[in-house]
């Protein structure tokens, strides 16, 4: 696979962006023949994977990737529970920042459902924009984690206007960078059905390499906090467990999706298990923060019967 070509990835994995990707390398499903000099000028469909989860027809509506849809619907419930638990820790360090991050992930999952389930079907005029928004939100989450990773070092006061502007501003830059890298690449391929360029190196650098670097920095920061600041090996274990789930999810999606799909007779593919791993990764991100932040025992917060927050400054 060339660095700027998605053909090798998309032939194995049914990623949403593959429906708007064009390449000279295509797989002919009827006889499993790979063509390297394919002319995609008048082709509206992107690179087809060797195997993908089958769709179902429900009430005259075609729903794609049903298994992955159920996982993402369940993920919405998990994120809502996490948001509720974060809101209950009134005095925890990084409460506002993590609340914002998980709100971003909630929005990302919603757009993932829109893209994966065919609410905006592949081939429609809106589909490339929804895919670009999904990629942009994923990038925003990665860029937000970059800033959140430094909270444990007390470089600035958490929860302040400055801190929230830093997190929100960085995530907004991440969204813009990933969205533009995606949609400009897509539009170069779909405008007037002409291929101005099939070079996607800019998109690969922004969406994959830069985001991966930011996630790596976040993990290193969390490890330093767990080992040097809070000195809690349970936190370190949660970090490694989350890292394991994340890496396992990427491997299942990008390396073994075809084998999974064929093994499950087209009912499931790598995206199903990748989504499960992503949910567990987010749970470990929350658990890591939960174990490293305790409410101030000298500053109690309770909720009255009328629903008002009551602050009690004193020993509990």
Swiss-Prot record:
Knockout or disruption consequences: Abolishes CHS3 localization to the bud neck with increased protein localization to the ER membrane.
InterPro entries assigned to the protein according to its UniProt record, in alphabetical order: Chs7 (IPR022057)
Transmembrane parts of this sequence: 62-82, 99-119, 130-150, 170-190, 200-220, 233-253, 266-286
GO BP terms, alphabetized: cell wall organization; chitin biosynthetic process; endoplasmic reticulum to Golgi vesicle-mediated transport; protein folding; protein transport
A GO cellular component annotation in the UniProt record: cellular bud tip
Domain of life: Eukaryota
Membrane topology recorded in Swiss-Prot or TrEMBL: Multi-pass membrane protein
Compartments where found: Endoplasmic reticulum membrane
Keywords assigned: Cell wall biogenesis/degradation, Endoplasmic reticulum, Membrane, Protein transport, Transmembrane, Transmembrane helix, Transport
GO MF annotation terms: unfolded protein binding
Pfam families per record: Chs7 (PF12271)
Biological function: Chaperone required for the export of the chitin synthase CHS3 from the endoplasmic reticulum.
Subunit structure: Interacts with CHS3.
Family: Belongs to the CHS7 family.
UniProt name for this protein: Chitin synthase export chaperone
Gene behind this protein: CHS7
